[in-house]
Amino acid sequence: MKPIRLMTYRNGSILPTLPGESLPNSSELFRIYEQTPGYSPILIVASIEEQPIAKLQAVIRRSVRLFPPSLIKRCEIFGTGEYFDTTYSQEELFGMMLEHLTNEVLKECFLIEFRNLPTALFGYKHFRQNGYFPVNWLRVYNSLHSLSPEKRLENKRKRQINRALKYGVTLQEALSEEDRSTFLQLLKRNYSSKLRKHFPALELFQLLTEESREEKSARTFIVKYRNRIIGGS
């Protein structure tokens, strides 16, 4: 079997052209991270004879806290990478990239966290071998196809929505930079009071919206009352 080569990229200017359609592992998101204050992206690429067969993207996030340690860095990874050659075991490729990434960032990060794993057992052996441990989180699954939105809502929620509409509350897409900025500032103030919650830098949302303007894969919706933004998503 031909040897697999692992490369680490930290600079978007030298990123090669890579296959794939996954946003968490895309070159576009890599460059967005680069432009966001406090964010440093890392891309691990596995290749054979210069042909990419897998990639795994991570981001190192710098956090400033009120209590010691006042400055910490944590590495976050969404998913388990993207794979392009079915002749190789995804779990084995993941294990190689996981070990490489762990050795690369552990010396500078307080914590390495994987989120949005496809299954609870994927890569379990490799996680254990590299010193990772599972954390239980509440997962909520909503089917978007079995029932219409109106039928999925509880009667109490329907009454709340109808009452809000009656008093003039409106929902619309935030198309102007001013509306998006106002809403993001509102969210940031809400998250700032929650010690265990993190709100990403505002630039990250703005860059995501700009980069996906044509595809509309990242959109902001706002709720207004008397021409004042009171919520959104």
Stretch-by-stretch model annotation:
Residues 63-134:
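Acyl-donor binding region in acyl/amide transferases
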